Amino acid sequence: MSLSPKQEQLFKQASKHIPGGVNSPVRAFNGVGGTPVFIEKAKGAYLWDVDGKRYVDYVGSWGPMILGHAHPDIIKAVQTAAEDGLSFGAPTVHETTLADIICEIMPSIELVRMTNSGTEATMTAIRLARGYTGRDKIVKFEGCYHGHSDSLLVKAGSGLLTKGEGEPTSKGVPADFAKHTLTLPYNDVAALKECFAKFGHEIAGVIIEPVAGNMNMVKPIDGFLQAIRDVCDEYKSVFIIDEVMTGFRVALGGAQSVYNVKPDLTTLGKIIGAGLPVGAFGGKREIMECIAPLGGVYQAGTLSGNPLAMRAGIEMFKHLRQPDFYSKLSAQLEKLLAGLQAAADEAGIPFKTQQAGAMFGLYFTDQEDITSFDSMLACDIEAFKKFFHGMLKRGVNLAPSAFEAGFISSAHSDEDIEFTIQAAKETFAEMK
């Protein structure tokens, strides 16, 4: 999609003082080509760019806008909070209220600590696992993203199961950090057991996205999450489920409630603040009591538990806890994905969709199942790029990467679904 001169000029201006013109790399459109669209405002299921063009949005600020953009109840809560003061650097009753809500909804969380982001939450959960166990090694999985802390920007090294060393995926990450992180194939129980057989007594914890959102959207195979629970129990390692993306998104109780698995620690992201900058980690009392000021594992943040995010989150949960909220959300997404699949089939284009609650993945492939990072890499990335730009041109905003999941909100109407399916029909016809 070619952008207006105004958009091109804005990107040029942004690139003058912002590295790459963006404040988060995926926004640069490197995964799909072209120049990013500059957004002016959002409301409900829609975004409007600086030229006034409207888009049906399936990114939702990367997941947290589950009620849609600028929901009036959330806006009112934030405005009321702002009138009382933006930040105090002191406790408020709203932190306690939100903590109570989270612990009630997720029984695996007995104590919870607020942070400023999902990255902070996962970074501290790793530190906490190490502090609790007195061990150094961490296990993670291909295709799972846990933020940009040094310990987690690591891929599998050639000597993983001989030397137990991973390799940094970013410059600036010391090899001494990476060597303590073991990266395994997602959904591979045999590799998990082999890793623990060799390094189990050195492993502080295992961290995983229960539904992997950094290889589009891949669900765990039957028994995979329980296998992690079992080896962590056997070797007394900490099981960390990263629900920054899935928490309160795939179900009210998160993915852990869907797959009936109980972690030792859980990390959460900005959805708990209705999209404002916030995160959290929580879990077993005996582990969480290792965090300062109760224990020797340090974590702090001036804006942790900031009143705007707390009060927005409290208001949001009133909607999420309605009895039929998630069933309606899931049904609406099923309707969308069925329509997209039918449109692709009619055009004769190999295409597959996957769904977990209100989270989805789109793949250009004739594979029956997408269960790993390797199967994701076997998909047609070039076809996705064409599809992305065709949909964007027709007023549908998808994640600008074949490796990112999509999201639907309660604001998406039947008309929005039909509009999207029609845009897909036209785009698929163009791709034939």
From Swiss-Prot:
Catalytic activity from the UniProt record: (S)-4-amino-5-oxopentanoate = 5-aminolevulinate
Names of required cofactors: pyridoxal 5'-phosphate
Superkingdom of this protein's organism: Bacteria
InterPro entries (alphabetical): 4pyrrol_synth_GluAld_NH2Trfase, Aminotrans_3, Aminotrans_3_PPA_site, PyrdxlP-dep_Trfase, PyrdxlP-dep_Trfase_major, PyrdxlP-dep_Trfase_small
EC code: 5.4.3.8
Location within or outside the cell: Cytoplasm
Protein's UniProt keywords contain Isomerase: yes
Modified residues (N6-(pyridoxal phosphate)lysine): K270
Alphabetical keyword list: Cytoplasm, Isomerase, Porphyrin biosynthesis, Pyridoxal phosphate
Entry's Gene Ontology BP terms: protoporphyrinogen IX biosynthetic process
Pathway(s) it belongs to: Porphyrin-containing compound metabolism; protoporphyrin-IX biosynthesis; 5-aminolevulinate from L-glutamyl-tRNA(Glu): step 2/2
Main location: cytoplasm
One MF annotation (Gene Ontology) recorded for this entry: transaminase activity
Range of residues in the leader sequence: none
GO cellular component: cytoplasm
Pfam families: Aminotran_3
Cytoplasm is among the record's keywords: yes
Entry's family note: Belongs to the class-III pyridoxal-phosphate-dependent aminotransferase family. HemL subfamily.
Subunit structure: Homodimer.
HAMAP family: HemL_aminotrans_3
NCBIfam families, A to Z: hemL, PRK00062.1
Protein name: Glutamate-1-semialdehyde 2,1-aminomutase
Organism of origin: Acinetobacter baumannii (strain ACICU)
